[in-house]
Curated annotation (Swiss-Prot):
Its cofactor is [4Fe-4S] cluster. InterPro entries: LIPOR_BchN/ChlN (IPR050293), Nase/OxRdtase_comp1 (IPR000510), Protochl_reductN (IPR005970). The gene is chlN. Its EC number is 1.3.7.7. This is Light-independent protochlorophyllide reductase subunit N.
Length: 418
């Protein structure tokens, strides 16, 4: 393992909660509905993050817990039953309904697992109910997907068929390109989890080889292991380097020669490196500080240092699963400072002291830092954007070069006015 400088911090933190993952999960599975059991704040968060007006009837909603529910003056279970009945009658196309816990529902100990069991009996054969927690007490925003996928694993049937299972939500067009690459090298049975329809869950078993597309799925990996799946450990498919090593790791698990892989991906890699050049010219030598939020930080740091030649000041991450991240850590330069957890005030002090050219952070910190003259990039954009794969390397780099270019233009215009 690379001799990185590991540190751990505890204290006040500034991150989105796991409810935010509903935004990309509901797009991935259009036959599913996500019902948050929470407060008006929860409802505002999801609606704002998704950019969808409520009259557009999106595939998510909030069962509002009022003050009387929180005070124990009303039966929240009865109210939830009523909301679910109304929802199913108005939206008969729903095939899977996720009951999503929040901070308020957990504070009053609302047992959504029992609620889901009862609803499954009542609506058997019509709608399937599962539950998970998106509470900010327990999760950062990407961990909501981990909870949702973990909740689906008990519903997955068993099989002894040999297959490759891509685990983690990615854009449909990215998934199609990955499958095309795997088919070209001789891996023909490739499925994805989560699937494009919630009712089409892949079957799994001892001959299922799992490779992650996202680094924040620790609980999902643990449960897939318990079902007998083999986990393929690899860097994550961000950039040319990460995507190449990711495909090579999958190929090795199926005993496919490296030469065959390179024959297929070499033309893609060459085009991607050429497309990266204009962004590398902007990013080369620039100092980067990554604050913890998404668990993508280590993979992004590897890409931005190794392929875009940025200097890493500090790489923060909410949680660090060393088993899942070992291959990524091995690709980082020695003495890279990695901080697990967060004491936001101390980290902001280090940001100011280090004078970075770019800070990757949450939306709540971005505007204050911009007001201090520090360029920022919202970490949530990495989850909402199709950034995976060799083909997307230049698009990923552009997410970081764009704020630097913008500030350069604004600075030149400001100087021109004097």
């Amino acid at each position: 393992m690379s001799k990185v400088d590991f540190n751990k911090e505890t204290g006040p933190r500034e991150v989105f909660c796991g409810l935010t993952s509903i935004v990309w999960l509901h797009r991935r599975m259009p036959d599913a509905f996500f019902l948050v059991v929470g407060s008006r704040t929860c409802a505002h968060l999801i609606q704002s993050a998704a950019g969808v007006m409520i009259f557009a009837e999106p595939r998510f909603g909030t069962a509002i817990l009022e003050e009387k529910d929180l005070a124990g003056l009303a039966d929240a279970h009865e109210e939830l039953d009523r909301v679910v009945n109304d929802l199913i009658s108005r939206r008969p196309e729903i095939k899977t309904l996720f009951l999503v816990g929040s901070c308020p529902s957990e504070v009053i100990k609302l047992d959504l697992a029992t609620v889901a069991e009862k609803l499954n009996l009542r609506f058997s054969g019509q709608v399937r109910f599962v539950n998970y927690s998106g509470s900010g007490i327990e999760t950062t925003f990407t961990q909501g997907e981990d909870g949702a996928l973990k909740a689906l694993i008990p519903l997955m049937n068993s099989t002894d068929d040999e297959k490759l299972l891509l685990v983690g939500t990615i854009a449909n067009n990215v998934e199609d390109r990955f499958k095309k690459i795997f088919n070209s090298i001789g891996i023909n049975n490739v499925e994805s989890f989560p699937p494009r329809q919630s009712t089409e869950l892949p079957k799994i078993g001892k001959n299922t080889k799992v490779i992650l597309t996202q680094p924040y799925l620790s609980d999902t990996v643990r449960d897939l292991k318990h079902r007998g799946c083999e986990i393929i450990y690899a860097p994550f498919p961000l950039g040319v380097e990460g995507s190449t090593k990711w495909v090579l790791a999958a190929a090795a698990a199926f005993k496919i020669p490296e030469l065959k892989v390179h024959e297929v991906i070499a033309p893609l890699a060459n085009r991607a490196r050429q497309a990266l050049q204009k962004h590398t010219e902007i990013l080369r030598g620039k100092k980067l500080f990554l604050l913890p939020e998404s668990q993508l930080e280590i993979s992004l740091a590897r890409f931005l240092h190794n392929e875009c030649e940025m200097e890493l000041i500090e790489v923060g991450t909410p949680y660090l699963n060393k088993d899942l991240m070992e291959e990524e850590l091995n690709l980082l330069p020695d003495d890279t400072k990695i901080v697990e957890g967060q004491h936001v005030e101390k980290q902001l002090d280090r940001v100011r002291a280090s004078c970075p050219d770019l800070v990757v952070c949450g939306m709540g910190l971005a505007n204050p830092l911009e007001a201090e003259g520090i360029s920022t990039k919202w970490s949530i954009e990495m989850v909402f954007s199709p950034i995976h794969g060799i083909d997307q390397a230049a698009d990923l780099a552009e997410l970081f070069s764009r704020p630097l270019t913008r500030n350069q233009i604004l600075t030149s215009k400001t100087l021109a006015t004097y």
